[in-house]
Amino acid sequence: MYDNALHIRHLGKQDYESVWHAMQHYTDNRDENSQDEIWIVEHTPVFTQGQAGKSEHILNPGDIPVIQVDRGGQVTYHGPGQLVVYPLLDIKRLKIGVRQLVTHIEQSIINMLKRYQIEAYAKADAPGVYVEERKIASLGLRIRKGCSFHGLALNVDMDMSPFQRINPCGYAGMEMIQCKQLGGPQTVEEAGRQLIETLSQELGLDKLVHHQGLPESYE
């Protein structure tokens, strides 16, 4: 039975494909009794190309794999030192629309960074979160059966050079920035703790239940 809580899954470091397939399975098998979950993960290096992605935005992938995925948006990079958060939410049950969900996610990142005196903002025409015109967080969602999957990536303390091999989110010359440069959270763990607080507040869900690892049936 749905327990009106937000279940937080701490996945640690995982390859992209296994987590992607697990969240597809979770979403496909949901019903009205399924829990709302947020998965927190750090991925091994990978470029993911969204449904709107164009191959010309992948400039020089080199030895980093490129995976075509079923989320919105263009190409982005995931790697160690980046916080990735996947909200697996029944937005119909929560009575919020897709645009509202995007706004809640963006605002939760902005509110979290404000705790570190970092002035961040969203853009109406380019999803994500920015600081001084440089992108600190990327966003790409998919809605299926009224439920969300995929999510956000926040640059914390990572090797930023792979972003130079692509046009991030389809924008040539898009500059990326990370928390470490700005005096923000210095570790993925710290960023995850802070962001879960602000995201759960934005969603109006204050009962949190923490778990380690993927659901047993998807491991």
UniProtKB/Swiss-Prot annotation:
Subcellular location: Cytoplasm
InterPro entries per record: aa-tRNA-synth_II/BPL/LPL, BPL_LPL_catalytic, Octanoyltransferase, Octanoyltransferase_CS
Annotated site (Lowers pKa of active site Cys): K135
Catalytic activity: octanoyl-[ACP] + L-lysyl-[protein] = N(6)-octanoyl-L-lysyl-[protein] + holo-[ACP] + H(+)
Name by which UniProt lists this protein: Octanoyltransferase
Positions of the BPL/LPL catalytic domain: 32-207
Gene: lipB
Keyword line: Acyltransferase, Cytoplasm, Transferase
Active site annotation, chain numbering: C169 (acyl-thioester intermediate)
Residues passing through the membrane, by range: none
Broad enzyme group: transferase
GO process terms (BP): protein modification process
Gene Ontology cellular component annotations, sorted alphabetically: cytoplasm
